[in-house]
Amino acid sequence: MDTVYTVGHGGRPIGEFVGLLQENGVRSIADVRKLPGSNRHPQYNRDTLRQTLAGHGIAYRHIPELGGLRGSTPDIPPQRNALWRNRSFHRYADYMSTAQFASGLAVLLHTARQTPTAVMCAETLWWRCHRRLIADALTAYGLSVVHILSLRRSEPAALTPGAVILPDRTLAYPARA
């Protein structure tokens, strides 16, 4: 498949969420939450969600290596990703240079090339979520990415302005001059 979707569950009713996936032809979910559970929205707990999606013919896979909320990554020069002023995004961009991230991305790339896949997290708005950086990584590998916002609204992803795709297909986000 040439297109990968991203979607945030946002605590929506599960039927609405499944409808979003079906409307976009999604057959597989890649859950990129570091902790795949929710006290406020138990319908999005890993096992419950897996069961619900299976009932609609949608596969589920948790990819913890792509989860957000990362700490500092040693040995990454601070200027490599200085474009990101938000500490969470900066740390995640640093983390994207690790073997652990590369391993998770390889799983996602394999899945996405086999079946229509959506990268899922909790945050509804892609620009406030680490899915935006995962979208950049997918773009670096030549895939198209579409952010699903609602039944009537989706947006094609574009590489973050200022992002640099390096020869090994990793990314850097240097500060703008």
Which role fits each region the language model picked out?
Residues 1-177:
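Residues lining hydrophobic/aromatic ligand-binding pockets adjacent to catalytic sites
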